[in-house]
Curated annotation (Swiss-Prot):
Molecular function, one GO term: crotonobetaine-CoA ligase activity
The entry's keywords: Ligase
One Pfam family per UniProt: AMP-binding
PANTHER family found in the cross-reference section: ACYL-COA SYNTHETASE (PTHR43201), MEDIUM-CHAIN ACYL-COA LIGASE ACSF2, MITOCHONDRIAL (PTHR43201:SF5)
Associated pathway: Amine and polyamine metabolism; carnitine metabolism
Catalytic activity reported: 4-(trimethylamino)butanoate + ATP + CoA = 4-(trimethylamino)butanoyl-CoA + AMP + diphosphate; crotonobetaine + ATP + CoA = crotonobetainyl-CoA + AMP + diphosphate; (R)-carnitine + ATP + CoA = (R)-carnitinyl-CoA + AMP + diphosphate
Organism from which the protein derives: Escherichia coli (strain SE11)
Protein name: Crotonobetaine/carnitine--CoA ligase
Length: 517
């Protein structure tokens, strides 16, 4: 089934400008409270100017351009400006340091970088010490260093005409983006995303939350992440809705932003829900227009119920990863929801549970979650310049091995158990980190929790818990272990406890477990 009809991203924006014109398309709020608004017509013009800027700097179809930016209008301009001329965006996690950023530059073959003064010193060092193909840097800030090969993004953009100067032939199968995975367990891999992928993501994600053109979709997720791009931005734009992009998440400011922009859809991860719950209760907690809160793993039922009750919202669960582009398993609009299920397979997808020999398992049995899609259309095309890694996870007929464990019930509802790499082998028993974390997270003194397996000469692995306490709380080892013994099987009780001020996380809020082992 082809729901795109040969329309690439250039055609999408030209059509959106014609159809929605002066309707608000994009609102960006900076951490300093500066708000920029663009209509669909104005945004398309800014995208065209940005495309022309890249063309004047020698960027042509197939060239790679890296973006190292926090959430800002320039990210949106560059994303679609590059797509309009057939160039390829390479977003870099804005929290990465020199070595990691240099590695992505080298492995993506990016020849131009758009960044801000905040990150520029790091790239000066990269240019001096690392072998990359980078030949020019555009800075989004007004003040510029007196360096060769550096120019002002804003000044160059504002000099460009609002109509597109370079429009090479485009196909929906053309690559629009190479998005490097967060790499919590190994080196990041470049996920190749096509024009078709992004167009499909927009329609699919709009369907998933029944998005309309009078909706306002607010997100604080980072723009360099697949959730922001494909679950939020592409959905909002494809439906002609208003997309609100907040620069950075603040638990204190979040509900005020939801109310100020009259948001009807937003998205949350567990870290956000937990930090929102520790904010002082307010009479305004339920004063909002949210219809759906898109939610991504993992949360205990007690935490979910408390959040929904306090704020008067419901969670729409969505399960996916960079390689699936969208939440390929999730709750459906208008359908029943069955917590803690992650939902059912969405349209255009098949899903099943397989054993270690790649054989389908019956309902109720735990195995690997596998998804069938169409590479380059409904799932990623490949890993960039890495056919071995591609072949490891993607079968020739479109079956994708997620590396996650779960099971399915008789009605087709799927249940997530854990990442395979997060299963602890303890004395012959398999222990799910997520299961333990959900239990421990219900302790009233604990704000955040992660458990990992550490080497044990007798039991294969021992379990260690890292916890962050709520402000002003203290927790003794005796109290912690007693709580665990009362709430889980004996073989699941952690052997060690470490209390920390925070936990290492990547840009999408996922805990980087390898930093704790």
């Amino acid at each position: 089934m082809d729901i795109i009809g040969g329309q690439h991203l250039r055609q999408m924006w030209d059509d959106l400008a014609d159809v929605y014109g002066h309707k608000t398309a994009l609102i960006c709020e900076s951490s300093g409270g500066v708000v920029n608004r663009y209509s669909y017509l104005e945004l398309n013009q800014e995208i065209n100017r940005t495309a022309n800027l890249f063309y004047t700097l020698g960027i042509r179809k197939g060239d790679k351009v890296a973006l190292h930016l926090d959430n800002c209008p320039e990210f949106i301009f560059c994303w679609f400006g590059l797509a309009k001329i057939g160039a390829i965006m390479v977003p870099i996690n804005a929290r990465l340091l020199r070595e990691e950023s240099a590695w992505i530059l080298q492995n993506s073959q990016a020849c131009l970088l758009v960044t801000s003064a905040q990150f520029y010193p790091m790239y000066q060092q990269i240019q001096q010490e690392d072998a990359t193909q980078l030949r020019h840097i555009c800075l989004t800030d007004v003040a510029l260093p007196a360096d060769d090969g550096v120019s002002s993004f804003t000044q160059l953009k504002n000099q460009q005409p609002a109509t597109l100067c370079y429009a090479p032939p485009l196909l929906t199968d053309d690559t629009a983006e190479i998005l490097f995975t967060s790499g919590t367990t190994s080196r990041p891999k470049g996920v190749v995303i096509t024009h078709y992928n992004l167009r499909f993501a927009g329609y699919y994600s709009a369907w998933q939350c029944a998005l309309r053109d009078d909706d306002v979709y607010l997100t604080v997720m980072p723009a360099f992440h697949i959730d922001c791009q494909c679950t939020a931005a592409m959905a909002a734009f494809s439906a002609g809705a208003t997309f609100v992009l907040v620069e950075k998440y603040s638990a204190r400011a979040f509900w005020g932003q939801v109310q100020k922009y009259r948001a009807t859809i937003t998205e949350c991860i567990p870290m956000m829900i937990r930090t929102l719950m520790v904010q002082p209760p307010s009479a305004n907690d339920r004063q909002h227009r949210l219809r759906e809160v898109m939610f991504y793993l993992n949360l205990s039922e007690q935490e979910k119920d408390a959040f929904c009750e306090r704020f008067g919202v419901r969670l729409l669960t969505s399960y996916g990863m960079t390689e699936t582009i969208v939440g390929i398993i999730g709750d459906r609009p208008g359908d029943k929801r069955r917590w803690p299920s992650i939902g059912r397979a969405g349209f255009c997808y098949e899903a099943e549970i397989r054993d270690d020999h790649n054989r389908p398992l019956p309902a109720g049995e735990i195995g690997e979650i596998c998804i069938k899609g169409v590479p380059g259309k409904t799932i990623f095309k490949e890993y960039f310049l890495n056919p071995k890694a591609t072949a490891k996870v993607l079968e020739a007929d479109g079956w994708l091995h997620t590396g996650d464990t779960g099971y399915c019930d008789e009605e087709g509802f799927f249940y997530f158990v854990d990442r395979r790499c997060n299963m602890i082998k303890r004395g012959g028993e398999n222990v799910s980190c997520v299961e333990l974390e959900n239990i421990i997270a219900t302790h009233p003194k604990i704000q955040d929790i992660v458990v990992v397996g550490i080497k044990d000469s007798i039991r294969d692995e021992a379990i260690k818990a890292f916890v962050v306490l709520n402000e002003g709380e203290t927790l003794s080892e005796e109290e912690f272990f007693r709580f665990c013994e009362q709430n889980m099987a004996k073989f699941k009780v952690p052997s060690y406890l470490e209390i920390r001020k925070d936990l290492p996380r990547n840009c999408s809020g996922k805990i980087i477990r390898k930093n704790l082992k």
